């Protein structure tokens, strides 16, 4: 996996390059994830739209994004491009997305320990400035958004 600032700058570069393409096609760019394990890298682009995303939507976006990536060549290593909907276990990338899903159960993994922990699972209470508020059992944690590596909604079936 890329480390710290390198990840942030690579993601910012990809976001700036690819999000406008997704938006121009009529979709919301929900988020971008770029991960690398050994020699294999994966670029995941999550798209959304009113009424949901179909396989054809992913194919349309994938073709356009592939063209941009071929021309701009922002990734120097081999990688796999994946375009998908956020799905039921929707990943959360921005402070606005965390605010939108307040009241939902979440799973959060941090880049480095916070109060002795890296993994949190509990109720997303909301946001306070640049902190995500999560209640785990009877304890509330204010997690700095910059420390969050991955966060997903945990679907509940009532």
Swiss-Prot record:
Compartments reported by the entry: Cytoplasm
PANTHER family tied to this protein: RIBOSOME MATURATION FACTOR RIMP
Matching HAMAP family: RimP
Record carries keyword Thylakoid: no
Name the record gives this protein: Ribosome maturation factor RimP
This protein's UniProt keywords: Cytoplasm, Ribosome biogenesis
GO BP term, pick one: ribosomal small subunit assembly
Protein purpose: Required for maturation of 30S ribosomal subunits.
InterPro entries, sorted: Ribosome_maturation_RimP, RimP_C, RimP_C_sf, RimP_N, RimP_N_sf
Any one GO cellular component localisation term in the record: cytosol
Superkingdom, taxonomy of origin: Bacteria
Record-linked Gene3D superfamilies: Ribosome maturation factor RimP, C-terminal domain, RimP-like superfamily, N-terminal
Family, as annotated: Belongs to the RimP family.
């Amino acid at each position: 996996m890329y480390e710290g600032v390198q990840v942030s700058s690579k993601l910012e570069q990809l976001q700036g390059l690819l999000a406008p393409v997704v938006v121009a096609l009529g979709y919301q760019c929900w988020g971008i994830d770029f991960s690398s394990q050994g020699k294999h890298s994966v670029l995941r682009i999550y798209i959304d739209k009113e009424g949901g995303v179909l396989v054809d939507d992913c194919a349309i976006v994938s073709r356009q994004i592939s063209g941009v990536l071929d021309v701009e060549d922002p990734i120097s290593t081999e990688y796999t491009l994946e375009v998908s909907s956020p799905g039921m276990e929707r990943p959360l990338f921005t402070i606005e997305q965390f605010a939108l899903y307040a009241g939902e159960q979440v799973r959060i993994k941090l880049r480095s320990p916070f109060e002795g922990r890296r993994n949190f699972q509990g109720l997303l209470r909301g946001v306070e400035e640049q902190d995500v508020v999560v209640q785990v059992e009877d304890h509330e944690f204010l997690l700095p958004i910059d420390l969050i590596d991955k966060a997903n909604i945990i679907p509940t079936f009532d």
